[in-house]
């Protein structure tokens, strides 16, 4: 793990400068970001925060995601500022709200309550779920760390009955918090049956936020069982770009020949965030098929 190593300020600054260098390919900037995330110190947080005025919504959303995964309270003012900035793209504001939920400091509850009423559904739904997570962590004294080295937006459900979880997942009458809990349980079960059930969430038309989270979780699983469903939503030009981009990255994580060929077809998509996602996903697929032990080299 990178975080176990000691880095000088100068070394951290070199990664930060690489992240903020707009002349570098996006895939190189992503690798610099992941190194800073794994280091996790305040200086890393500051470098990541400095990049949140970039032109790439994809990069900015990943910056906010990483700040949440680091769970460093030093990032809270930066994330609140991004959430409040209506000029930021919805996918970036959403990720800032989710990151505040991941850090789960009680001080963010008021701002999450405020933006749980935001007119943008991706933002309001995110803040409702994030507030639920902060309150759950407060009440239970536990975190929502997953077997996938990530901080989940909600805990997993208490049942392991795949059919029951599948029904909860696609029930639009239930709160998103409960459906997310079913989602993470299906992921953790990790059978072909649970993955197929999970993939059906990509067809739930009631929430783009929900579909994008399903795609993200399928990327964590890296199972070719879900390839067709991910392909369906990437190919759908009317789909929300948040969902299409997450489908692209999930296909990159699966990294087989079929997925790589799909990504190559969309590397020139009209939507910038989809184009860039395919570029990064192809880089990730190349890594998955290489002998490299670590994606973000130091």
Curated annotation (Swiss-Prot):
Gene Ontology BP, a term: peptidyl-lysine modification to peptidyl-hypusine
Region (Disordered): 140-159
Cofactor note as given: Binds 2 Fe(2+) ions per subunit.
Chemical reaction(s) catalysed: [eIF5A protein]-deoxyhypusine + AH2 + O2 = [eIF5A protein]-hypusine + A + H2O
Observed phenotype of the null mutant: Embryonic lethal with the production of multinucleated cells from the one-cell stage of embryogenesis leading to the in utero accumulation of abnormal and enlarged embryos.
Physiological role: Catalyzes the hydroxylation of the N(6)-(4-aminobutyl)-L-lysine intermediate produced by deoxyhypusine synthase/DHPS on a critical lysine of the eukaryotic translation initiation factor 5A/eIF-5A. This is the second step of the post-translational modification of that lysine into an unusual amino acid residue named hypusine. Hypusination is unique to mature eIF-5A factor and is essential for its function.
Name of the featured protein: Deoxyhypusine hydroxylase
Organism for this UniProt entry: Caenorhabditis elegans
């Amino acid at each position: 793990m990178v975080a176990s190593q000691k880095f000088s300020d100068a070394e951290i600054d070199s990664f930060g400068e690489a992240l903020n260098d707009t002349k570098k390919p996006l895939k190189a900037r992503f690798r610099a970001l992941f190194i800073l995330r794994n280091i996790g110190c305040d200086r890393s947080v500051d470098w990541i925060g400095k990049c949140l005025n970039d032109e790439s919504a994809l990069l900015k959303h990943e910056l906010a995601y990483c700040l949440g995964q680091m769970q460093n309270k030093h990032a809270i003012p930066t994330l609140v500022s991004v959430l409040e900035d209506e000029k930021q793209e919805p996918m970036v504001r959403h990720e800032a709200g989710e990151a505040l939920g991941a850090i789960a400091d009680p001080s963010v509850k008021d701002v999450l309550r405020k933006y749980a009423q935001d007119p943008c559904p991706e933002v309001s739904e995110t803040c409702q779920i994030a507030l639920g997570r902060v309150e759950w962590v407060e009440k239970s004294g536990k975190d929502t760390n997953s077997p996938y080295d990530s901080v989940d937006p909600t805990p997993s459900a208490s049942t392991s009955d795949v059919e029951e979880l599948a029904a909860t997942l696609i029930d639009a009458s239930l709160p998103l918090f409960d459906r997310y809990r079913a989602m993470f349980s299906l992921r953790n079960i990790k059978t072909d049956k649970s993955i197929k059930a999970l993939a059906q969430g990509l067809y739930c038309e009631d929430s783009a936020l929900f579909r994008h989270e399903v795609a993200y979780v399928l990327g964590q699983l890296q199972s070719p069982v879900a390839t067709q469903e991910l392909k369906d939503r990437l190919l759908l030009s009317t789909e929300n770009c948040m969902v299409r981009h997450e489908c692209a990255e999930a296909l990159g994580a699966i990294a087989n020949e079929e997925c790589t060929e799909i990504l190559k077809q969309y590397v020139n998509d009209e939507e910038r965030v989809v184009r860039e996602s395919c570029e990064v996903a192809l880089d990730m697929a190349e890594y998955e098929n290489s002998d490299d032990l670590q994606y973000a080299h130091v």
